[in-house]
UniProtKB/Swiss-Prot annotation:
It comes from Burkholderia ambifaria (strain MC40-6). Pfam families: 60KD_IMP (PF02096), YidC_periplas (PF14849). Belongs to the OXA1/ALB3/YidC family. Type 1 subfamily. Its main location: membrane. Keywords: Cell inner membrane, Cell membrane, Chaperone, Membrane, Protein transport, Transmembrane, Transmembrane helix, Transport. The lineage of its organism: Bacteria, Pseudomonadati, Pseudomonadota, Betaproteobacteria, Burkholderiales. Interacts with the Sec translocase complex via SecD. Specifically interacts with transmembrane segments of nascent integral membrane proteins during membrane integration. This is Membrane protein insertase YidC. It comes from the Bacteria. The gene is yidC.
Length: 554
């Protein structure tokens, strides 16, 4: 019995340690087991240096960050920030490059919790995250040039207006003029980006359009134990979802699909993502690289057919910038829902989230949905749990006889083991009989953990009374205390190990885990508390009502 219990505790403890180590690595802290790349300081607002008259050849994307004043001998044009507002965004477009330089997601606070508003794109001294485009293939307009707003009018989506269009015109460079138009649609996190290329020169031109996301490696919203993958990602039909670690870009060893005519590129962070989605069928090269200390970019380069003098070409793309809401992402582009990263348990986690979502649609509260899903999972696994608890009850029944044998043969381990094996055989007890049912449930346990950790729906979602945000820790630590109590009760239902050291360890484990759970999101702790309470009820029912424990005469 003590061997089985030790195995279970080791499995549980190692799972917790690995999860903790993953949290450490996911937001820049050193791993307990593996060396990590040195974390560099956040890039300054200006990003890499560059000049307004940068000449780029095919394949070279200028590295200067939008907002950096170009260094030229001639007076530089003055860039401006054009503010705009829709029902889902507040933002700013920098006329230097016509770059989307700031984007705040208004619906995350739902008008009632402004502290939950999330600024996705930003360009400050402490944080850089931009979406920008330009032309390659000659001395053509790029993100370092100052654009002019075209037909300046209302910059807010008002009344029954369904869409807001903002257009910006570049200066003529290399015989080319660019008109960039952003289209914001009511209720949508997808922004239309149209790049019109006019050949106003006297010779044909064959430019290449680049579309990229630029970001530093600074995580936002970083309470302990609540972050998943942070960094670039690429999706193609051939290689599917490919995450790119900043540390791999530091070492110039990132491995991902470099060319395609489908898919998208993205920057992913906890709960939110942005992605450039070029037109399906348009051939493009894909790149991801480090461009400055702690500043990175991922993007595509899409060639444009030759444009004759006096003619023009349009390159249309979509830019997603919003929350990782799985159902919404599925309708935007193939594979985009994968930015909501469940890791290696995706095959189990996705159906669990689907079920959680259905339950929420019925009860209207994510906290109660977690409770009901936990009850449902326990019901499904009841036969396995029953087998485990019956085995534990039988082991508990023969524990006094096991202790007597250990005492009798304590000087001869070989005879003691033989006597124990004979006892197991006579009583038809398998000392590991309770392990397998628990091991089978571990992937589901871990999957539900990642579902609750990765789901933006938990952000700002209340449960009852003092729990106002299931994605944050319990402000009064009530749930962690309840979890500690439930773990102690579970421990007391099991026989005391004969080894005093092991007995002390069994008493210490609930305290150790509870301290760690003090900093877990409330939604996760709620799941553990409900799971423990149901496990206690199951164990009591099975051992007391199904004859698992028999009274022995004194």
């Amino acid at each position: 019995m003590d061997i089985k219990r030790t195995v279970l505790w080791v499995i549980f403890f190692m799972s917790a340690v690995m999860l903790y180590d993953n949290w450490q690595r996911s937001h820049g802290r050193p791993s307990m087991f593996f060396p990590s790349a040195t974390q560099t300081a956040p890039a300054a607002a200006g990003g890499a240096s560059g000049t307004g008259a940068t000449t780029t050849t095919a394949g070279e994307v200028p590295a200067a960050a939008a907002g950096t004043a170009p260094s030229t001998t001639a007076p530089a044009a003055q860039a401006q920030l054009v503010k705009f507002s829709t029902d889902v965004y507040d933002g700013e477009i920098d006329t230097r490059g016509g770059t989307l330089a700031k984007l705040t997601l208004k619906k995350q606070g739902d008008g009632k919790q402004p502290d939950l508003y999330i600024t996705l794109f930003d360009h400050t001294a402490g944080h850089t995250y931009l979406a920008r485009t330009g032309l390659l293939g000659g001395d053509f307009p790029n993100h370092n040039d100052v654009y002019t707003q075209v037909n300046a009018g209302p910059t807010s989506l008002t009344g029954d207006q369904n869409a807001l269009k903002l257009s910006f015109e570049s200066p003529v460079k290399g015989g080319v003029k660019v008109v960039k138009t952003y289209t914001f649609t009511r209720g949508s996190y997808v922004i239309g980006v149209d790049t019109k290329i006019d050949n106003v020169g006297t010779a044909p031109v064959t430019p290449t359009v680049y579309m990229e996301l630029v970001r530093d490696n600074t995580a936002v919203e970083t309470p302990m134990f609540s972050h998943t993958f942070l960094g670039p990602a690429v999706y193609t039909d051939a290689k599917h979802f490919q995450k790119i670690d900043f540390s791999d870009l530091d070492k110039n060893k990132a491995n991902f699909e470099k060319a395609a005519d489908n898919g998208w590129v993205a920057m992913v962070q906890h709960y939110f993502a942005s992605a450039w989605i070029p037109q399906q069928g348009a051939k493009r090269d894909i790149y991801a690289e480090k461009i400055d200390p702690a500043l990175y970019r991922v993007g595509v380069k899409q060639p444009v057919a030759a444009i004759a003098p006096g003619q023009s070409a349009d390159v249309q793309a979509r830019l997603f910038a919003g929350p990782e809401e799985e159902r919404m992402l599925e309708g935007i582009a193939p594979g985009l829902e994968l930015v909501k990263d469940y890791g290696w348990v995706t095959i189990i986690a996705k159906p669990l989230f689907w079920l959680l979502e259905k339950i929420h649609g019925f009860v209207g509260n994510w906290g109660w949905a977690i409770v009901l899903l936990t009850v449902l999972i326990k019901a499904v696994f009841f036969p396995l749990s029953a087998a485990s608890y019956k085995s534990m009850a039988r082991m508990k029944e023969i524990t006094p006889r096991m202790q007597a044998l250990r005492e009798r043969f304590k000087s001869d381990p070989q005879k003691m083991n033989a006597a124990l094996m004979e006892l197991y055989k006579t009583e038809k007890v398998n000392p590991f009989g309770g392990c397998l049912p628990v091991v089978i449930q571990i992937p589901v346990f871990i999957s539900l953990y990642w579902v609750l950790l990765a789901s933006v729906e938990m952000r700002g979602a209340p449960w009852i009374l003092w729990i106002h945000d299931l994605s944050q820790r319990d402000p009064f630590f009530i749930l962690p205390v309840l979890m500690a109590v439930s773990m102690f009760v579970q421990t007391s239902l099991n026989p005391t190990p004969p080894d005093p050291v092991q007995a002390k360890m069994m008493k210490f484990m609930p305290i150790a885990f509870s301290v760690m759970f003090f900093f877990f999101p409330a939604g996760l702790v709620l799941y553990y508390v409900v799971n423990n309470v149901l496990s206690i009820a199951q164990q009591y029912y099975i051992t007391r009502k199904l004859g698992g424990v028999k009274k022995k005469p004194a």
